[in-house]
Every structure is written in structure tokens, then in C-alpha cells.
Swiss-Prot record:
Lineage per the UniProt record: Bacteria, Bacillati, Chloroflexota, Chloroflexia, Chloroflexales
Subunit and interaction comment: Homodimer.
Protein name: tRNA pseudouridine synthase A
PANTHER family: PSEUDOURIDYLATE SYNTHASE, TRNA PSEUDOURIDINE SYNTHASE-LIKE 1
Family: Belongs to the tRNA pseudouridine synthase TruA family.
Entry keyword annotation includes tRNA processing: yes
Active-site positions on this chain: 52 (nucleophile)
EC number: 5.4.99.12
């Protein structure tokens, strides 16, 4: 029995989420249907990160146990040939039997994209959240530094959580860029794991900082759970799961494969 890992990107607009659900299309459902079409096997795909309806991914990871004899290159080409247009396989590699896409991960990286132009770009409407008021990105970047380190992020979460709500945030920053002359604000956050709606609540609160509605102390109060009313949930369609990282020895095989199938540049951009 082989254990195959896949690196996946998708446009989350028309999905009800990444996990199997009974009320519409899911990323997991589409992947499993494509796998069965390619290999004849009915297998369960294990996803590294759970994304909500409308959330996109540039570097989702899944693994599947299989008896297929298809080469890795054939798996990539074959899945991309039968998957719907809003999902793509970027890479595939062999992993040890004990590898688990979710539980073996040591770092997850998310990006939130804000269209901050004078008028919203129609080209970005499904892939960036529009904020009309010019944001003070420097103030947002100063505020977000407070989340770096080990903290209880329960004040930024929604709904019941499994186990501890303490997470380790490795990096967090707010920067500016432009696409087609349209100013964008990028919010990047990396942590060992995330709680439900943690990034979207963080972003929504940071927008309050950028608009001058709350200051750094107000942001700190939200993080401490002392000012839950100032917390705002940002729209799903601006959020991207950019990458999932694994222990260094688990990526060596991936590096070899990616070079072999000619998608090194794609993987390096994750």
C-alpha cells in the first residue's frame, strides 16, 4: 500500500467548503470522485486544513492510501484531466505510511487579500474583499505584531473547538502591493494551527485598526477577550490557504518529485 501526498490549489467560490458536506460541492468530494475515476479506487482523501465556503487555497495538502501503480507524474496529469476547472494538482509525492496531511503538519500559512481601491475592481470581486476607506497599513502591521508568539486565541475563534485553544503564531505582517494599478493590502499569518474563523476574525479586527476605529490598545483588548464587540468577521472570499509545511525530512521526496515533473517554479511560489 502506497501513501501519496498531493499539493492542491482551488478557487473556493463555488464550494461549500473543503470537507465533505451533504448540502453541496466540497473540495474533498471532488478530489475523491476524480481519484476514483482515475484509479478505480474509492478512497478517503485526508486534507491538511479545513477551509470554509468561499475560501481559496494555493497550497492545500492531502494524502491518500492507494494500491494504484500509476506513476506520480501520471497521477498529476490524470487528476488534472478529470478534476473540475476550479481545482488543480500542483505536485504529488510518496510519503511514509504514517504520514497524515493534517496531524503531521507543523506550520500553516494563510494570506488575506483586501482590495483597497477607490472603487472595487470587478476582476477581484471573487478573490479579494473590498474595503473602500483607505487603510493605515503601517498601523495594522504594528498591531498584528501582538499576535506573534504563543497565545490563547479563543477570543478570535467561533463555535466549539477541539482541545486546546492555544496556538503558536510564527509570523504575521501587513503589506501593500498593486495589481493592474489597484492597491491591495496583504495580511499574512503563519502558525502551527488555526482555530475556526481565527484568521477572518483577526483580519476583520485589523481592518478596524486600519480605518482608525480602534487603536493598538483596542486591538489588544480584543485579543484578550475584553472587547468582543470590536471583533468583526472578515468575508471568506479574501482568504487563501497558501502553504502547509511538514518536518524537513518529509519534504525531501517532494523536492525530488517536483523537479522531476517540471513544476519546481510553481512549488517554490507557495
Amino acid at each position: 500500500m502506497r501513501n501519496i501526498a498531493l499539493r492542491i490549489e482551488y478557487d473556493g467560490t463555488d464550494f461549500v467548503g473543503s470537507q465533505w458536506q451533504t448540502n453541496g460541492r466540497s473540495v474533498q468530494g471532488a478530489l475523491e470522485a476524480a481519484w476514483q475515476q482515475l484509479t478505480g479506487e474509492r478512497r478517503r482523501m485526508i486534507l491538511a486544513g479545513r477551509t470554509d465556503a468561499g475560501v481559496h487555497a494555493r497550497g492545500q495538502v492531502a494524502n491518500v492510501s492507494t494500491n494504484t501503480r500509476h506513476s506520480l507524474a501520471t497521477i498529476i496529469r490524470g487528476l488534472n484531466g478529470v478534476l473540475p476547472e476550479d481545482i488543480g494538482i500542483l505536485a504529488a509525492w510518496e510519503v511514509p505510511e504514517e504520514f497524515h496531511a493534517r496531524y503531521s503538519a507543523v506550520r500553516r500559512e494563510y494570506r488575506y487579500v483586501i482590495d483597497n481601491g477607490r472603487t472595487p475592481s470587478p476582476l477581484l470581486r471573487r478573490h479579494a474583499a473590498y474595503v473602500p476607506r483607505r487603510l493605515d497599513v503601517a498601523a495594522m502591521d504594528r498591531a498584528i505584531q501582538q499576535v506573534i508568539g504563543t497565545h490563547d486565541f479563543a477570543p478570535l475563534s467561533d463555535g466549539p473547538q477541539e482541545g486546546s485553544t492555544v496556538r503558536i503564531c510564527y509570523d504575521a505582517r501587513c503589506t501593500c502591493t498593486e495589481v493592474w494599478g489597484q492597491p491591495l493590502v496583504l495580511i499574512d499569518v503563519a502558525a502551527n494551527a488555526f482555530l475556526r474563523h481565527m484568521v477572518r476574525n483577526l483580519v476583520g479586527t485589523l481592518i478596524q485598526v486600519g480605518e482608525g476605529r480602534i487603536d493598538a490598545d483596542g486591538f489588544a483588548a480584543v485579543l484578550a477577550g475584553a472587547n468582543r464587540r470590536a471583533r468583526v468577521l472578515a468575508p471568506a472570499h479574501g482568504l487563501y490557504l497558501m502553504a502547509v509545511r511538514y518536518p524537513e525530512d518529509g519534504n525531501a521526496a517532494a523536492d525530488t518529485l517536483v523537479a522531476a515533473v517540471g513544476v519546481t517554479e510553481t512549488r517554490m511560489q507557495l
